[in-house]
């Protein structure tokens, strides 16, 4: 549950939220590991700031 909250926080602080969400969705389809998806979200959020 805590990880979901972190993801929400990252998405809400991201300026280009819709692009980020689409990228994450594409990545999540390819990657079975939730941790890898969360890492990707974090990296993308850092990249867009």
Curated annotation (Swiss-Prot):
Q: Which UniProt keywords apply?
A: Chloroplast, DNA-directed RNA polymerase, Nucleotidyltransferase, Plastid, Transcription, Transferase
Instruction: Say which domain of life the source belongs to.
Output: Eukaryota
Q: Which GO terms describe its cellular component?
A: chloroplast; DNA-directed RNA polymerase complex; mitochondrion
- Principal localization? plastid
Task: List S-S links within the chain.
Answer: none
List the molecular function annotations (GO) for this entry.
DNA-directed RNA polymerase activity
Enzyme Commission designation:
2.7.7.6
Which reaction is the catalytic activity of this chain?
RNA(n) + a ribonucleoside 5'-triphosphate = RNA(n+1) + diphosphate
Q: According to its UniProt record, where is this protein located?
A: Plastid, Chloroplast
What is its biological role?
May be involved in RNA polymerase activity.
Q: Which family does it belong to?
A: Belongs to the RNA polymerase subunit omega family.
Name by which UniProt lists this protein = Putative DNA-directed RNA polymerase subunit omega
Source organism per entry reads Cyanidioschyzon merolae (strain NIES-3377 / 10D)
What's the encoding gene here? rpoZ
